[in-house]
Curated annotation (Swiss-Prot):
The lineage of its organism: Eukaryota, Fungi, Dikarya, Ascomycota, Saccharomycotina. GO terms for cellular component: cytoplasm. NCBIfam families: kynureninase. This is Kynureninase. Catalyzes the cleavage of L-kynurenine (L-Kyn) and L-3-hydroxykynurenine (L-3OHKyn) into anthranilic acid (AA) and 3-hydroxyanthranilic acid (3-OHAA), respectively. Belongs to the kynureninase family. Its main location: cytoplasm. Its cofactor is pyridoxal 5'-phosphate. The modification N6-(pyridoxal phosphate)lysine is found at residue 254. It comes from Debaryomyces hansenii (strain ATCC 36239 / CBS 767 / BCRC 21394 / JCM 1990 / NBRC 0083 / IGC 2968) (Yeast).
Length: 460
């Protein structure tokens, strides 16, 4: 592998880096005599926070201008209507045809609202219905802690304790959970499970769970199925409607580049909202923004839910947050959609894998050794992961100054290579097809190997 090969691959796969604001050595506060202050960083951290699309600044300023020029009037009479801007009362509606194809849902099955965990809690209150022996929730061990807290408290609301949470662990000698282990667990616990709710992509290992197969298995036993798509949305193609998923939640500040704490979203299969009559609607955490829009401002004490996922909205959304995520969603459409991006992503992460596995420091997943090196925790099969590779450094040292991962990460940071560390020993590398290139992926691995060489020589 060489930088020349990387450049040839860059000629085959377009980059949209020019559409984004890229942090530089100067903006990151990094002084390195080898580089000009204006040199772009290599940003491999879109799995934690996506970069800012350049058009986001204009989109936000348009709404600040509307606020300053018309105040409350902009809810119904936006000053930018002539150039296609939306009045605030309907600000989120233009996003539905943009997000629906990214998650593989119909427009009436998606809503832009809330935050990831608040949405998960809202879905749990509507879809977690323990009854008789079927009271338990199944999810993976090492799920993102916020999910665990939500599941635990949902169980406690119904009077159950943590014994009603079933978690599948990675088997000894493995680095991720096998699909057959999940299927076996669902089958063995079919009489106890009220809900199955895994991560679409596991945040720590980067594993892309087989959503279709797992959902089909659980549904065959009459079990409700939800998914946390925080690391899947905008990363891999999804087919939530066709997979018959009951509900899903996601955030937008990672692969959808909406900005820190950006507005999130939900999917609710249309079968759950088709009978949203006043008499028959499914109980949920409700609010006025989920009510029939034509009657919303009549302030009636009648909940008449919209016949779509929009009925799960509670309050009017933050206008600034909505237009921020809309900017990025429009980029997805502009470049041909998630399926086109996935083609590049598979090759880009495959290139990253090839570079890492060709190193003398690479240790196979099944190998047991304490030598200096690293393992890839993520599945090596390209179809079983998104863009992220989770790299485990060893041997483990508790002391910060000796810790291999910390020393590698510091060296990368000093060279303006931005990635995500997960203590005690993991660095998550995520080359994104929107704004990362094969050339910078090559350079990033080159720097990583340099760091390992310096550690081996006791130079850092």
């Amino acid at each position: 592998m060489s930088i020349e090969q990387a450049k040839k691959l860059d000629e085959c796969f377009p980059t949209y880096k020019e559409e984004f604001e890229i942090p530089t050595f100067k903006s990151l506060g990094i002084q390195n005599d080898e580089y000009e202050d204006s040199t772009d960083s290599i940003y491999l951290c879109g799995n934690s926070l996506g970069l800012m699309p350049k058009i986001t600044r204009t989109a936000i300023n348009d709404e600040l201008n509307a606020w300053s020029e018309r105040g409350v009037e902009s809810h119904f009479r936006h000053p930018g209507e002539e150039k296609g801007l939306t009045s605030w009362v309907d600000i989120d509606l233009p996003l539905l045809p943009l997000i629906a194809p990214i998650v593989g849902g119909k427009e009436n099955e998606v809503a832009v609202m809330g935050t990831l965990t608040s949405n998960l809690n809202a879905m749990l209150m509507s879809f977690y219905k323990p009854s008789g022996k079927k009271t338990k929730i199944l999810f993976e061990k090492q799920a993102f802690p916020s999910d665990y807290y939500a599941f635990l408290n949902a169980a406690k609301i119904f009077g159950y304790n943590e014994d009603h949470l079933i978690q599948i662990e990675i088997k000894e000698g493995k680095t991720y959970i096998e699909t057959e282990d999940i299927i076996e667990t669902i089958t063995n616990h079919q009489d106890e499970l009220a809900l199955v709710c895994f991560s679409g992509i596991q945040y720590y290992t980067g594993q892309f769970f087989n959503i279709g197969e797992i959902t089909e298995c659980a549904k065959s036993f009459g079990i409700t199925v939800g998914w946390d798509l925080a690391h899947a949305v905008g990363n891999v193609p999804l087919q939530l409607h066709d997979w018959d998923v009951d509900f899903a939640v996601w955030c937008s500040y990672k692969y959808l580049n909406s900005g820190p704490g950006g507005i999130a979203g939900i999917f609710v299969h249309e079968k759950h909202t088709k009978d949203n009559s006043i008499e028959q609607f499914k109980p949920r955490l409700a609010g006025w923004w989920g009510n029939n829009a034509s009657d919303r401002f009549k302030m009636l004490e009648v909940f008449d839910p919209i016949k779509s996922a929009l009925s799960y909205r509670q309050s009017n959304p933050s206008v600034i947050d909505v237009v921020a995520v809309k900017s990025s969603l429009e980029l997805f459409k502009k470049v041909g959609g998630i399926s086109e991006l996935r083609k590049k992503s598979v090759e880009l992460t495959g290139f990253l894998q090839a570079l890492l596995t060709s190193s003398k420091y690479y240790i196979k997943q099944e190998e047991t050794t304490d030598r200096l090196g690293f393992k890839i925790l993520s599945p090596l099969n390209k179809g079983d992961r998104g863009c992220q590779l989770s790299v485990l450094f060893q041997p483990h040292y508790e002391e910060y100054s000796k810790n291999i991962m910390e020393r590698v990460n510091k060296y990368l940071s000093d060279h303006a290579i931005v990635c995500d560390e997960r203590r005690p020993d993991v660095i998550r590398l995520a080359p994104l097809p929107l704004y990362n290139t094969f050339s910078e992926t090559f350079i990033a691995v080159q720097r990583l190997i340099e760091a390992m060489d310096k550690i081996a020589a006791n130079e850092i």
